[in-house]
C-alpha cells in the first residue's frame, strides 16, 4: 500500500453517513462544486502528493485530479462503505482510498505536499486533533486546508429545513447543525488552524448556486437518511413528516418556472506548515 499506510478495518456501515448513493443527491453534488473552487483557490504547484481526509464519496479527490494536476492522491475515510464507493467512482490510477481515523491517520509524517479535508471537521469528536494530524502528515512548507458548510446562515437548503422543522417541533432545534456546530464560523476555524501551529492562516467564503428543478427534487434527498437533517426527517411518523414537507413547500422560494433557486456557502480555511522543505523533499 502506498506511503506506508497501515490500513484500518473499522466498518462504519451503520453510520448515518455510510451510504454513498444516498449522499450524492443530498450533499455530494453540491460538495463537488465547492471542492472544485476550493482546490482552484489553493493554487498548489502541479505534481504534488495530496491527502484527502474524510474523503467520503471522493468529491475533493476528484477535484484535485481534475484541477490540481497531482502526482498522487490518497483518500481516507472512517466509513468502509464510502471508501468502496470512492474506489468504484474514481478509476484514475493516481488515486487510492483507504479506511482510516482522522484522529490517527494511517500515514507517516511529512509525506504530503497538501493535506485537505472537506465537510468533515465539525462531525469529528476532536477537530483539533484532526487538524494536528493534517499538519503532521504535511511536509514543512506544505499546505493544509479544509472547508465546512456555513450551517448558521449560508447553506440554504439545510437552513430552510431546520427553520421549518424547528417551527413544528422544538426538539428539532437541538439537532440543527447551525446550533450544534459553532466550529463552522470564520473565527473558530482560524483559531483551530492557528492552534495547530499552522502559519499564514486565511478563511474565506465559497458560494455556489444550488438550483432544484422543482420541490420534489429538493425534498426527496431528505428521505435518504444521510446526515442529521435526513436522519431527523426519517425518524418522524408519516403524518409529521408530511406536515414538515408541506411547511417546507410553503417557505422555500420558487421561481416562475417552479424551480427552487438557492445557494450554498462554505467557509474555507488554509494555512502552511512552518519550516522549509529539505532539498529533494
Residue positions per predicted region:
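Conserved Class I S-adenosyl-L-methionine
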Residues: 13-19, 57-59, 179-281
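Conserved alpha-helix/loop element of class I SAM-dependent methyltransferases that forms part
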Residues: 29-48, 63
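Class I SAM-dependent methyltransferase SAM/SAH-binding core
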Residues: 49-105, 128-129
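Conserved catalytic/acceptor-binding region of the Class I
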Residues: 128-129, 135, 139-213, 229, ...
